[in-house]
Regions:
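Flexible N-terminal pre-Rossmann segment of NAD(P)-dependent oxidoreductases
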Residues: 1-17
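Conserved glycine-rich cofactor-binding loop
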Residues: 22-24
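Aromatic pocket-lining residues of Rossmann-like dinucleotide-binding sites
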Residues: 33
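Rossmann-fold cofactor-recognition segment
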Residues: 60-76
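Conserved Rossmann-fold cofactor-binding substructure of NAD(P)-dependent oxidoreductases
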Residues: 73-90
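A glycine-rich helix->loop->beta "capping" turn
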Residues: 61-64, 86-97
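Conserved glycine-rich Rossmann-like NAD(P)H-binding loop of the short-chain dehydrogenase/reductase
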Residues: 38-52
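Conserved N-terminal Rossmann-fold NAD(P)-binding element of oxidoreductases
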Residues: 16-20, 43
Length: 98
């Protein structure tokens, strides 16, 4: 059986938005993407959880991610527009969304 081992820089120069990044699958995805060199936007409901993930990423040598606390279930149209505007100002594009 073959086991694929991607190069540790396979996601370098890739910008990925991770929803639910404060815990669970979102957190694990964010940590994995960071390990492979991605620039991350961490979206989640709880700022303290996002900060914990950010600290893990930085401690392990990853790039500092952008944090954006927002509850998608209760967000208003204006909240979504503000989030989109923030991303457009800080990043030229997105390569992936989880």
């Amino acid at each position: 059986m073959l086991q694929y081992q991607p190069d540790h820089t396979v996601l370098r120069d890739k910008i990925i938005l991770v929803t639910g990044a404060g815990d669970g699958i979102g957190k694990e995805a964010a940590l994995t993407y960071a390990r492979y060199g991605a620039t991350l936007i961490l979206l989640g409901r709880t700022l303290s959880k996002l900060e914990d993930v950010q600290n893990e990423i930085i401690t392990s040598g990853g790039q500092q991610p952008m944090l954006y606390p927002l509850d998608l279930l209760t967000a208003s149209e204006n909240d979504y527009q503000e989030f989109a505007d923030t991303i457009v100002k800080r990043f030229p594009h997105l390569d992936g969304v989880l």
